[in-house]
Amino acid sequence: MKTTFMAKPADVQRKWYVIDAEGKPLGRVAAEAARILRGKHTPMFTPHVDTGDHVIVINADKVILTGKKLDQKMYTRHSGYPGGLKEFSYRTMMEKRPELIVEKAIKGMLPHNRLGAQQFKKLKVYVGSEHSHEAQKPEVWNF
């Protein structure tokens, strides 16, 4: 009888990839980054094991949105107190914290459990084109 291959955490060889978000739609950048973080780009993908690689997203401030989402897309957060709902448009978030927009988009595409939190820790997002991970020799990911 044949059995399905299940990767073990010790078997995983992690790589580093750089994604340049300049001029690319937010959803496409987030989907590719989430795919790499989960490990779905490798043949040894196992759903319950973190088989993903590290991802560095550069130029997060130059990511684009299609349509009227620049003004219509809203981000919300709540303090937990009555009347504590805060809403921010995409435009104001882009002015204040553009890296947070990319992080939230990618985090929403990862599993919502402890494994997803572990995979999210392998994500690094930078506003400019410079990053501090040259020692890891990251490969450029084109899509």
Swiss-Prot record:
Look up the domain of life of the source: Bacteria
Q: Which GO terms describe its biological process?
A: negative regulation of translation; translation
Q: Which cysteines are joined by disulfide bonds?
A: none
PROSITE patterns assigned to the protein according to its UniProt record, in alphabetical order? RIBOSOMAL_L13
Give any Gene Ontology cellular component.
cytosolic large ribosomal subunit
What does the UniProt keyword field contain? Ribonucleoprotein, Ribosomal protein
> GO: which molecular function terms?
mRNA binding; structural constituent of ribosome
Tell me its family.
Belongs to the universal ribosomal protein uL13 family.
What does the UniProt function comment say about this protein?
A: This protein is one of the early assembly proteins of the 50S ribosomal subunit, although it is not seen to bind rRNA by itself. It is important during the early stages of 50S assembly.
Q: Which NCBIfam families match?
A: rplM_bact
**The protein's name in its UniProt record:** Large ribosomal subunit protein uL13
Q: What's the source species for this entry?
A: Desulforamulus reducens (strain ATCC BAA-1160 / DSM 100696 / MI-1)
Q: Which gene encodes it?
A: rplM
